[in-house]
Amino acid sequence: MRLADTRPPFAGLTNLSWEALASLPTPCYLLDEGQLRRNGELLLGVQQRTGCKILLAQKAFSNFNVYPVLAPYLAGTEASGLYESRLGKEELPEKENHVFCAAYRADEFAELLQYADHIVFNSPSQLAKFGPAAKAAGKSVGLRLNPECSTQEGHAIYDPCAPGSRLGTTRAQWDAAVQQYPELPALLDGLHFHTLCEQDADALALTLAAVEAKFGGLLPRMKWLNFGGGHHITRPGYRLATLEQCITETQKKYGVQVYLEPGEAWALNAGYLVTTVLDTLQNGETSLAILDMSAACHTPDVIEMPYRPPLLDAGDPGEKPYLIRLGGPTCLAGDVVGDYSFASPLTEGQRLIFGDMAIYTTCKNNTFNGMPLPPIWAMDENGTCRELVKFGYSDFKMRLGRAAD
C-alpha cells in the first residue's frame, strides 16, 4: 500500500496491499507482527544495556496468539489477577510470572500460587493476610508503594497518587502497619510502584526521587524494585538515556534487580481497526458519518480517557477541506470517535483505518447494544493477513445467561 500518511501509527501498512485490505471483514482488529517485533527489539536493547528485566503488562495487550513474536524479547508477564496470571503461565510457561491486584480473594489465592512466582500486595493488611502463604509456597513477595508524587495532568482517572487513592501504600500507612504487625518487613523481597501513564522518563526520574525520599531506608534490604508501567519507551523521541540512567543508578546504589512492566510500549502502533462507512448525513452545519465500529464497544478508551485516535489520511479539524464527525451505530448519543478533516467527502462503503489499535481494545471491548465483537487478524512482515479468531451471536448470548438444554 502506498501511503501518503507517514505517521508512526501507520508505518507498518506499507506492505499491506489494497487487495488484502479489501478482503478483510469490517470492523476488524489487525495486529502488526512486524511492529511488535520492532518494539520488542528496542525493549530488549534496554534490558541488555542495563541488566533490567521488562515484563509485558497483559492488561494492555493480551492477544496470546502473537506472544511467540514477543517471547524472545520479554522477561515475563505482569498480571492483574488470576486469569491473566494463568494466561501468562499457559502461553509463556518458561517466563517469569508477576501479579499485582488491589485485593486478592481468599477463594482464588491457592490457585494463583500455581501460576505466579512474584506476588505484589497493595496494602499491609493484604500482605499480612496472604504473605505468609506466598512465602511458604516459595514465591517472591512485594508491596506496592504510593510515593504520593503525581506527575500527570488532565488524567486523574489514571493517577494512582491522586488524593484518596486506593492504590499503593503510603509511608504513613506502612509505619502504622509495622507498629501493629512487626513481622511485615521480613515478608518482603521487593517493592513496586506504578504511577505513570503514557509518560516520558523525566516523570520516572521525579517519581524515583520521591520513592527514595520516602522509602529509601527499605531498599537496601530488598532483592528487587519494580518501576511499574506507563513508560512510553517505544514512542519516537522517548528519553532512553534518562530511563537507562535511572535503572543503572538504582541497581548500583541498592543492589536490586530492577523490573519494568509496560503494556503499551510492547504493542505501541502495532495494530489497526479497519472499519466501513455505513451512512453519511448532515445535521445543520455538522457533517457526520456512521461507521460499523463503535467507540463505546470497540475502543472504549476513546470515551473513558478520552482521546482521539489517529486515522489514516485524515487530519485535525481545519487541516483539510471537509470536516466530518465519525460515530458508531449504537443508541448512545456519545458514541463518537471524534471530528476529522478529509481531502474529500466520505462515501458509503468507504474503508477507514484507525491506528494504534492493539492496546486497550481487544482486552476491553464489549457487546453493548448487541454489537458484534470484531474478529482479530494478524499481519506478518510481508503483508500477509490471517484470521486469529472471529466471534458470533453465541459469544454475545453466552455472556448473558445459559441456553436451555
Give the ranges of each region predicted by the language model.
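A short small-residue
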Residues: 18-24, 190-194, 228
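Active-site-proximal beta-alpha core segment in soluble small-molecule metabolic enzymes
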Residues: 49-224, 246-249
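Feature marks short, surface-exposed loop/turn motifs that line or immediately flank catalytic pockets
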Residues: 149-151, 197, 233, 266, ...
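Glycine-rich beta-strand-to-loop/alpha-helix junction loops that act as flexible
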Residues: 194-196, 225-234, 262-265
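Charged helix-capping and loop-helix junction motifs
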Residues: 205-210, 239-245, 275, 341
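Charged (often Lys/Glu-rich) extended helix/loop segments that serve as interaction or gating elements
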Residues: 246, 257-405
